[in-house]
């Protein structure tokens, strides 16, 4: 555990990061991040392969090499139209291929306990530290980002009280004024 007197932001960030890795989270890889769509496509398609391979094969049969871009477009449309929280609980559907994908599995939506719990446990939680979410010379970054199945669900910006920063002001201002 972090020493009490060490109140800097980086050791605290690293402590959170290490704790989550030690408790089942995966490390996110920069190379898997799709900046244009704000998704970790590596974790996204790993989740789909692990939980819905038949549906994914139908999508591949319909779209060939473009199946990933088609799914990403459908997912982004769903999130844009319905909002992230609603989208996480609904299906992503492609009518041309006749496919329906669950974005995540929740304990409350489990139909059959054994099968449902197995699917729930295949959710992929990942974490990135010093996460830059845009490609430009001086990109915005957050201290930590948490993803569920490749979808960013939590951004954490740590503040140091000893440096005069206040999370209620500095963090809020930073997210409202300097983030897209």
Regions found by a protein language model. Name each.
Residues 2-180:
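An alpha-helical interface "stripe"
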């Amino acid at each position: 555990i972090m020493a009490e007197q060490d109140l800097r932001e980086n050791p605290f960030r690293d402590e959170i990061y290490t704790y989550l890795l030690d408790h089942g989270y995966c490390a996110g890889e920069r190379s898997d991040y799709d900046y244009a769509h704000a998704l970790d496509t590596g974790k996204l398609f790993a989740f789909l392969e692990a939980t819905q391979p038949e549906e994914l094969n139908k999508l591949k049969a319909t779209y060939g090499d473009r199946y990933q871009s088609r799914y990403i477009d459908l997912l982004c449309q769903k999130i844009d139209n319905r909002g992230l929280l609603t989208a996480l609980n609904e299906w992503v559907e492609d009518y041309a291929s006749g496919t329906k994908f669950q974005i995540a599995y929740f304990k409350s939506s489990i139909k059959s306990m054994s099968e449902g719990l197995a699917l729930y446990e295949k959710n992929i939680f990942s974490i990135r530290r010093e996460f830059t979410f845009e490609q430009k010379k001086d990109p915005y970054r957050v201290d930590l980002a948490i993803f569920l199945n490749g979808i960013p669900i939590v951004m954490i910006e740590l503040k140091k009280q000893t440096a005069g920063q206040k999370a209620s002001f500095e963090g809020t201002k930073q997210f409202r004024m300097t983030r897209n």
